[in-house]
Amino acid sequence: MKKTIMASSLAVALGVTGYAAGTGHQAHAAEVNVDQAHLVDLAHNHQDQLNAAPIKDGAYDIHFVKDGFQYNFTSNGTTWSWSYEAANGQTAGFSNVAGADYTTSYNQGSDVQSVSYNAQSSNSNVEAVSAPTYHNYSTSTTSSSVRLSNGNTAGATGSSAAQIMAQRTGVSASTWAAIIARESNGQVNAYNPSGASGLFQTMPGWGPTNTVDQQINAAVKAYKAQGLGAWGF
């Protein structure tokens, strides 16, 4: 399928201006006029935009830490990549749940992604193949160490989601793992006739729950609005 990509439009939206990458120079967010909040939003909620075009023309190497996550955006002028992960392996201080590593990343042009892109002008025609964004939720053990009296657990995916919730809310990962175990038994696609769905059984008003990322975002919104009372605590 032929598709025209306006690569510069994403750069304008992000406010990436006034920077020319030199050989071997790594540009941190502070060195260029970058809207960090918008980049973070793209990484968590609009991966398709980052997959479709680089954030600016030419080579760049941008890294910054925000809200407990390390964000990376790089390009050699021909291919580009982006990723985010928990900064500095921040799993210390979370009790009762095995340490987790959470990474979302996309590497345009890599062997794994099987995407072809020929960088020309910002209005060039490109031949592209749809590529997935990888979401890696993993724990060092095969199951959660939180187990309720009825046998429910948070499961591997739920334990990783609990770690991320702890980083984003300040509530312990063990508390979130217990909520996940009680609400969904660690089932990502759990659905209740009331309309509640996902690991955290959030209602539609808090946002979509098609992916684990969306389920985490919806749970964060519910927590910010109602605290743990959203889950009856």
Curated annotation (Swiss-Prot):
One of its GO terms (molecular function) is hydrolase activity, acting on glycosyl bonds. Residues 1-29 form the signal peptide. The keyword Transferase does not apply. Gene3D superfamilies: 1.10.530.10. Its main location: secreted. The keyword Repeat does not apply. It is found in: Secreted. It holds the Pfam family SLT. Its EC number is 3.2.-.-. Keywords: Glycosidase, Hydrolase, Secreted, Signal. Disulfide bonds: none annotated. GO terms for cellular component: extracellular region. It comes from the Bacteria. Is able to cleave peptidoglycan. Belongs to the transglycosylase family. IsaA subfamily. This is Probable transglycosylase IsaA.
